[in-house]
Amino acid sequence: MAQYKGAASEAGRAMQLMKKREKQREQLEQMKQKIAEENVVKANINKKFSAHYDAVEAELKSSTVGLVTLNDMKAKQEALVKEREKQLAKKEQFKDLQLKLEKQRERERKKEQKRKIASLSFNLEEDEECEDEEADDDYDDEEDDDDEDDDDDDAEKEELPKKKKKLGKNPDVDTSFLPDRDREEEENRLREELRQEWERKQEKIKSEEIEITFSYWDGSGHRRTVKMKKGNSIQQFLQKALEILRKDFSELRSAGVEQLMYIKEDLIIPHHHSFYDFIVTKARGKSGPLFNFDVHEDVRLLSDATVEKDESHAGKVVLRSWYEKNKHIFPASRWEPYDPEKKWDKYTIR
C-alpha cells in the first residue's frame, strides 16, 4: 500500500520557516535595542553640546555692544568657543586632580594608621618575660587536665611567630638635615628681620641730604648748587634746578622739565634714575665718577699710578633744543646715553 509523503515534507518546511522567522524576529529586536541605546547616547551628547552652545551664545551677547562687522562677530565667537573649551578641559583636569588627591590622602591615612599600630605593638623585654611566664603557667594547668590538649598547645606555640625586638633612636645621630618645622620657622623669622633691617638702612641712606653742584650750559657754564636727598630722582633735581635758573635765564621761563637734559661725566642721565642708584653701584662715567661718594681711593693704572681726585666734574643742565643744534660740536659731540651695563675702566677727556 502506497503512503502519502507530501504532508510530512510540508510540515518540515513549515517548521523551518517558523524557526527562520523566529530568528529574524530576535535579530530585529536586537537591532531595535541597539538603535535605542545609540539614540540615548546621541541625546546626551546633544544636551552637552546645547549647554555649551547656549553658554557661548550668552557670553557673545553680553560682550557685544552696538553694531559690529561679520568678521569681528565670527572672530569673537571663535575666541569664546575656544575659551569655553579651555574651561571645560580645566574642569576635567580639576576633577582628575581631586581624585588623585583623595587617593593620596587615603594612602597617607592608611600609612599613618599602620604606623600607629606598629608603635602600639612595641613591648619591652620585661613585658615579654612576664608573658612567657604566664604562658608556661597556663600550659602546666592544661597539661594536668588533658593530654590531648597538651599536644594542641604545643602545636599552637610552634605556630606563633616570635616577637621582634625594636631598636630605639640613637641620640648621637645628626638629624639637622631632616625637616624641622620649628627650625624652619625660626630661620624664616630671622630672614624677615634681616630684610626689614636692610630696608630701614636703605631708607635712612635715601633720606640723607647731599649738595649737588651743577652748571647750566648754553655754550658756557653758569654754576649753581642745590641741596637734594639721595633718594630723589633726576627729574626732581631738574625741577628744583629749573626753579633756580628761571630767575636769571629768560629762555627757561617757558620750559618744562621734560625739555631739560642732565649730563654727568659726558653721559646723558635718564630722568627716572636717582642719586641713590649711582651711589650704591659706584657708577662711573667717561671722564670721572658720576658721583664721588665712596670712590676716593680708586686707582687708575696707565703709564704710571695716578689717584683719582675727590671731586668730579659738575653736571651740566642743558636744554634739549640746544643739544639737538650743537650735538656735532665739542663738548656735546662726546655725550652719549647712559648704559648701566657699560663699564668705563679708564677715564678720558677727548
From Swiss-Prot:
Its main location: nucleus. GO terms for cellular component: nucleus. Coiled coil: none annotated. Residues 124-157 have a biased composition (Acidic residues). GO terms for biological process: mRNA processing; RNA splicing. It comes from the Eukaryota. The keyword Nucleus applies. Residues 1-29, 104-186 are annotated as: Disordered. Keywords: mRNA processing, mRNA splicing, Nucleus. It is found in: Nucleus. Probably involved in the regulation of pre-mRNA splicing. Belongs to the FAM50 family. This is Protein FAM50A.
